[in-house]
Amino acid sequence: ECLIGNYVVTGARRCAPPLSLGTGFYEGNALVLSTYVQGKWYVMAWNKLVSRPFVLQHQLYFQEGIVHEDDLWSFKLACMAQSMYVVDETTYYYSMQPDSIMRAPSMRNLECRVLVLGYIYDFIRSSRCLQDNRLIYIYFESLKAKYFDRILYFTKDTSFHYQSYLVFRNKKYASLLEMTGLRPEWKLMLQNIHYVLPTYAGYLYFKAFVKSAYYLLVLSIKMKAVFHAK
Protein backbone atom coordinates (compact mmCIF):
# COMPACT_ATOMS: atom_id res chain seq x y z
CA GLU A 1 0.00 0.00 0.00
CA CYS A 2 2.98 2.31 0.53
CA LEU A 3 6.56 2.45 -0.73
CA ILE A 4 9.16 4.63 1.01
CA GLY A 5 12.70 5.47 -0.10
CA ASN A 6 15.61 7.20 1.59
CA TYR A 7 16.66 10.79 0.88
CA VAL A 8 19.44 13.35 1.19
CA VAL A 9 18.94 16.94 2.39
CA THR A 10 21.29 19.81 1.57
CA GLY A 11 21.29 23.35 2.93
CA ALA A 12 20.18 22.39 6.45
CA ARG A 13 22.36 22.91 9.50
CA ARG A 14 20.27 20.66 11.70
CA CYS A 15 19.67 16.99 11.05
CA ALA A 16 16.62 16.03 9.02
CA PRO A 17 14.41 13.18 10.26
CA PRO A 18 16.16 9.99 9.15
CA LEU A 19 14.85 6.80 7.64
CA SER A 20 16.10 4.18 10.08
CA LEU A 21 14.46 1.10 8.60
CA GLY A 22 16.24 -1.42 6.44
CA THR A 23 15.13 -2.46 2.99
CA GLY A 24 12.26 -4.90 3.19
CA PHE A 25 8.55 -5.59 3.51
CA TYR A 26 6.75 -4.48 6.67
CA GLU A 27 3.45 -6.29 7.06
CA GLY A 28 0.62 -5.53 9.47
CA ASN A 29 -0.67 -2.18 10.68
CA ALA A 30 0.75 -2.69 14.18
CA LEU A 31 4.26 -2.78 12.71
CA VAL A 32 3.71 0.06 10.24
CA LEU A 33 2.20 2.31 12.91
CA SER A 34 4.71 1.51 15.64
CA THR A 35 7.67 2.26 13.37
CA TYR A 36 6.14 5.62 12.44
CA VAL A 37 5.32 6.87 15.94
CA GLN A 38 8.80 5.80 17.07
CA GLY A 39 10.26 8.07 14.39
CA LYS A 40 11.75 5.33 12.24
CA TRP A 41 10.34 6.79 9.03
CA TYR A 42 9.94 10.43 8.19
CA VAL A 43 6.89 12.68 8.33
CA MET A 44 7.38 14.44 5.00
CA ALA A 45 4.91 13.38 2.31
CA TRP A 46 7.42 13.43 -0.53
CA ASN A 47 9.36 10.35 -1.59
CA LYS A 48 6.43 8.08 -0.79
CA LEU A 49 4.44 6.09 -3.34
CA VAL A 50 0.95 5.26 -2.11
CA SER A 51 -1.59 3.03 -3.83
CA ARG A 52 -4.27 5.13 -5.53
CA PRO A 53 -7.12 2.74 -4.56
CA PHE A 54 -5.86 2.94 -0.97
CA VAL A 55 -5.93 6.76 -1.05
CA LEU A 56 -9.45 6.79 -2.47
CA GLN A 57 -10.75 4.12 -0.10
CA HIS A 58 -9.53 5.92 3.00
CA GLN A 59 -9.98 9.45 1.62
CA LEU A 60 -6.35 10.12 2.45
CA TYR A 61 -6.26 13.68 1.14
CA PHE A 62 -4.28 16.69 2.30
CA GLN A 63 -6.14 18.98 4.68
CA GLU A 64 -6.91 22.19 2.82
CA GLY A 65 -6.03 25.65 4.07
CA ILE A 66 -3.05 24.76 6.26
CA VAL A 67 0.70 24.26 6.06
CA HIS A 68 2.55 21.41 7.79
CA GLU A 69 -0.21 19.17 6.50
CA ASP A 70 2.44 16.46 6.04
CA ASP A 71 2.34 15.81 9.79
CA LEU A 72 -1.37 15.02 9.67
CA TRP A 73 -1.28 13.12 6.38
CA SER A 74 1.62 10.83 7.30
CA PHE A 75 0.09 10.08 10.69
CA LYS A 76 -3.17 9.03 9.04
CA LEU A 77 -1.23 6.97 6.50
CA ALA A 78 0.55 5.13 9.31
CA CYS A 79 -2.74 4.51 11.12
CA MET A 80 -4.40 3.01 8.03
CA ALA A 81 -1.72 1.19 6.05
CA GLN A 82 -1.59 -2.59 6.45
CA SER A 83 1.68 -3.00 4.57
CA MET A 84 4.73 -0.97 3.59
CA TYR A 85 7.88 -1.59 1.58
CA VAL A 86 11.07 0.31 2.39
CA VAL A 87 13.96 0.93 0.01
CA ASP A 88 16.98 2.04 2.02
CA GLU A 89 18.59 3.78 -0.94
CA THR A 90 18.58 7.46 -1.84
CA THR A 91 15.68 8.10 -4.18
CA TYR A 92 15.13 11.80 -3.42
CA TYR A 93 17.35 14.89 -3.06
CA TYR A 94 15.92 17.85 -1.19
CA SER A 95 17.55 21.28 -1.07
CA MET A 96 16.32 23.31 1.88
CA GLN A 97 16.16 27.05 1.21
CA PRO A 98 17.09 29.69 3.83
CA ASP A 99 13.58 31.18 3.79
CA SER A 100 11.69 27.87 3.84
CA ILE A 101 8.82 27.42 6.29
CA MET A 102 10.95 24.96 8.26
CA ARG A 103 13.84 27.38 8.79
CA ALA A 104 11.96 30.69 8.97
CA PRO A 105 8.32 29.99 9.85
CA SER A 106 5.78 32.82 9.93
CA MET A 107 3.07 33.21 12.56
CA ARG A 108 0.72 31.48 10.14
CA ASN A 109 3.04 28.47 10.10
CA LEU A 110 3.05 28.35 13.90
CA GLU A 111 -0.72 28.74 14.06
CA CYS A 112 -1.01 25.79 11.69
CA ARG A 113 1.04 23.68 14.10
CA VAL A 114 -1.70 24.21 16.65
CA LEU A 115 -4.39 23.39 14.08
CA VAL A 116 -2.59 20.22 12.97
CA LEU A 117 -2.37 19.00 16.55
CA GLY A 118 -6.12 19.52 16.84
CA TYR A 119 -6.77 17.52 13.67
CA ILE A 120 -4.57 14.69 14.93
CA TYR A 121 -6.44 14.77 18.24
CA ASP A 122 -9.78 14.50 16.44
CA PHE A 123 -8.52 11.56 14.40
CA ILE A 124 -7.31 9.70 17.49
CA ARG A 125 -10.62 10.39 19.23
CA SER A 126 -12.46 8.78 16.32
CA SER A 127 -10.97 5.35 17.14
CA ARG A 128 -11.00 3.51 20.46
CA CYS A 129 -8.10 1.38 19.24
CA LEU A 130 -5.95 4.47 18.69
CA GLN A 131 -6.90 5.87 22.09
CA ASP A 132 -5.88 2.63 23.79
CA ASN A 133 -2.54 2.43 21.95
CA ARG A 134 0.34 3.23 24.31
CA LEU A 135 2.71 4.31 21.54
CA ILE A 136 0.09 6.65 20.07
CA TYR A 137 -0.34 8.30 23.46
CA ILE A 138 3.41 8.80 23.88
CA TYR A 139 3.66 10.13 20.32
CA PHE A 140 0.79 12.59 20.73
CA GLU A 141 1.94 14.02 24.06
CA SER A 142 5.52 14.26 22.79
CA LEU A 143 4.24 16.06 19.69
CA LYS A 144 2.77 18.75 21.94
CA ALA A 145 6.21 19.41 23.43
CA LYS A 146 7.81 19.39 19.97
CA TYR A 147 5.33 21.90 18.58
CA PHE A 148 5.50 24.08 21.67
CA ASP A 149 9.29 24.14 21.39
CA ARG A 150 8.97 25.50 17.84
CA ILE A 151 6.48 28.12 19.01
CA LEU A 152 8.74 29.28 21.85
CA TYR A 153 11.78 29.40 19.57
CA PHE A 154 10.27 31.25 16.62
CA THR A 155 8.06 33.85 18.29
CA LYS A 156 8.32 35.99 21.42
CA ASP A 157 4.56 36.58 21.47
CA THR A 158 3.74 35.43 25.01
CA SER A 159 0.02 35.76 24.37
CA PHE A 160 0.32 33.24 21.53
CA HIS A 161 2.45 31.02 23.77
CA TYR A 162 -0.32 30.92 26.35
CA GLN A 163 -3.18 30.47 23.88
CA SER A 164 -1.31 27.60 22.22
CA TYR A 165 -0.77 25.98 25.59
CA LEU A 166 -4.47 26.19 26.37
CA VAL A 167 -5.24 24.29 23.17
CA PHE A 168 -2.60 21.66 23.93
CA ARG A 169 -3.86 21.28 27.49
CA ASN A 170 -7.47 20.83 26.37
CA LYS A 171 -6.60 18.29 23.66
CA LYS A 172 -6.25 15.49 26.21
CA TYR A 173 -8.09 12.25 25.51
CA ALA A 174 -6.81 10.19 28.47
CA SER A 175 -7.69 10.77 32.12
CA LEU A 176 -4.97 10.66 34.77
CA LEU A 177 -5.93 7.07 35.57
CA GLU A 178 -5.86 6.12 31.89
CA MET A 179 -2.49 7.86 31.49
CA THR A 180 -1.06 5.64 34.23
CA GLY A 181 -2.48 2.56 32.52
CA LEU A 182 -0.73 3.55 29.28
CA ARG A 183 2.61 3.37 31.12
CA PRO A 184 4.25 6.56 29.84
CA GLU A 185 8.02 6.93 29.99
CA TRP A 186 9.49 8.77 32.99
CA LYS A 187 10.27 11.87 30.92
CA LEU A 188 6.68 12.04 29.73
CA MET A 189 5.42 11.56 33.29
CA LEU A 190 7.45 14.60 34.32
CA GLN A 191 6.13 16.56 31.34
CA ASN A 192 2.53 15.68 32.16
CA ILE A 193 2.69 17.11 35.67
CA HIS A 194 1.37 20.30 34.07
CA TYR A 195 -2.07 18.66 33.75
CA VAL A 196 -2.56 18.44 37.52
CA LEU A 197 -1.53 22.05 38.15
CA PRO A 198 -3.83 25.09 37.93
CA THR A 199 -3.95 26.30 34.34
CA TYR A 200 -1.48 29.20 34.51
CA ALA A 201 0.89 27.29 36.77
CA GLY A 202 0.65 24.40 34.32
CA TYR A 203 1.56 26.76 31.49
CA LEU A 204 4.65 28.01 33.32
CA TYR A 205 5.68 24.45 34.20
CA PHE A 206 5.19 23.15 30.64
CA LYS A 207 7.08 26.11 29.20
CA ALA A 208 10.00 25.57 31.57
CA PHE A 209 10.00 21.83 30.89
CA VAL A 210 10.10 22.28 27.11
CA LYS A 211 12.87 24.90 27.33
CA SER A 212 14.93 22.68 29.64
CA ALA A 213 14.52 19.70 27.31
CA TYR A 214 15.73 21.85 24.41
CA TYR A 215 18.83 23.07 26.27
CA LEU A 216 19.69 19.53 27.36
CA LEU A 217 19.35 18.34 23.77
CA VAL A 218 21.62 21.11 22.48
CA LEU A 219 24.14 20.36 25.23
CA SER A 220 24.23 16.66 24.37
CA ILE A 221 24.74 17.45 20.67
CA LYS A 222 27.62 19.82 21.47
CA MET A 223 29.25 17.29 23.79
CA LYS A 224 29.03 14.59 21.13
CA ALA A 225 30.62 16.99 18.63
CA VAL A 226 33.48 17.72 21.05
CA PHE A 227 34.18 14.05 21.74
CA HIS A 228 33.92 13.26 18.04
CA ALA A 229 36.44 16.01 17.25
CA LYS A 230 38.89 14.50 19.73
Question: Which residues does each PLM region occupy?
Answer:
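Intrinsic disorder/low-complexity segments enriched in polar/small residues
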Residues: 9, 142-145
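Donor-binding/catalytic cores of nucleotide-activated saccharide
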Residues: 1-85, 92-106
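Generic detector of well-ordered alpha-helical segments enriched in charged/polar residues
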Residues: 33-34, 137, 166, 174
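All-alpha amphipathic helical-bundle segments outside canonical DNA-binding/catalytic cores
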Residues: 131-140
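Membrane-interface aromatic/basic loop that binds lipid-linked glycans or pyrophosphate carriers
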Residues: 156-230
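Catalytic core of nucleotide-sugar-dependent glycosyltransferases
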Residues: 90-97, 103-130, 145-177
